[in-house]
């Protein structure tokens, strides 16, 4: 397979009929923080557009034969062959209500019609049963990467140290908990998801090392920070998940190998 990714490019200034390729030197203002983070991590072709079908066509022109649409379940203008629904295992479905009264974008019963359910950091615990048994994934983090150099250090090197930690993601407490669970003494500061960081946001007078998420790092690498680190995380997936996806692709005639 030659995979590619399409995304809305949240936070980017981009017209509805415009398509942009995400490059390793793209700016967050051009393509959004999450697409740029994905590009730097996986390297596959990535295009952003509010009209995702246009981004898909751009991937097709590059020879991609599998398209992953980032955060695309509710983008019904784009047809799909396989749906993978990922839940945050800590927050799950909250109070079960739809936005704005709760965290859900659709009723929980929607999972009866999705192909795969993946729980991030927990097991399935609802009486509503998905089409297939839910699978588990866990985020693993073991080393810190310097924001402005190639240096990396084991996270354990910072155990029992005081650090500043910032997070502008959907669930910042997960990041802070990871640091605390590794023995770090955290002075935390929360920002909104997709926060456009400024120099003032990342300057602290206490002289402590500054730690951030990988997503926030793509927005802070423009600043000249001498003691700043970010924490890359990797998803440890169930061995069964890849096999099930391949089986599903075969059943849809996408794979004959």
How would you label these PLM feature ranges?
Residues 1-4:
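Post-Walker A helix-loop "phosphate-sensing" segment adjacent to the P-loop in P-loop NTPases
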Residues 9-130:
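Phosphate/Mg2+-binding loops and adjacent switch elements
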Residues 76-257:
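ATP-dependent carboxylate-amine ligase
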């Amino acid at each position: 397979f030659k995979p590619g990714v399409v995304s809305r490019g949240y936070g980017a200034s981009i017209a509805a009929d415009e398509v942009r390729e995400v490059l390793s030197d793209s700016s967050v203002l051009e393509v959004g923080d999450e697409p740029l983070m994905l590009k730097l991590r996986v390297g596959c072709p990535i295009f952003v557009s509010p009209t995702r079908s246009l981004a898909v066509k751009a991937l097709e022109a590059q020879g991609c034969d599998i398209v992953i649409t980032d955060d695309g379940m509710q983008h019904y203008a784009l047809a799909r062959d396989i749906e993978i629904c990922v839940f945050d295992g800590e927050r799950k479905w909250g109070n079960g209500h739809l936005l704005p009264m709760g965290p859900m974008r659709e009723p929980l019963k929607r999972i009866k019609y999705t192909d795969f359910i993946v729980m991030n950091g927990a097991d399935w615990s609802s009486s509503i049963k998905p089409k297939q048994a839910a699978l588990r994934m866990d985020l693993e983090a073991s080393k810190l990467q310097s924001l402005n150099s190639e240096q990396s250090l084991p996270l354990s090197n910072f155990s029992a140290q005081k650090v500043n930690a910032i997070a502008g993601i959907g669930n910042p407490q997960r990041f802070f908990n990871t640091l605390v669970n590794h023995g770090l003494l955290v002075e935390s500061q929360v920002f909104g998801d997709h926060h456009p960081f400024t120099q003032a946001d990342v300057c602290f007078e206490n002289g402590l090392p500054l730690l951030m998420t990988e997503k926030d790092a793509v927005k802070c690498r423009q600043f000249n920070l001498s003691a700043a680190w970010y924490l890359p995380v990797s998803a440890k997936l169930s061995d069964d998940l890849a096999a099930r996806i391949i089986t599903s692709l075969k059943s849809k005639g996408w794979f004959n190998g």
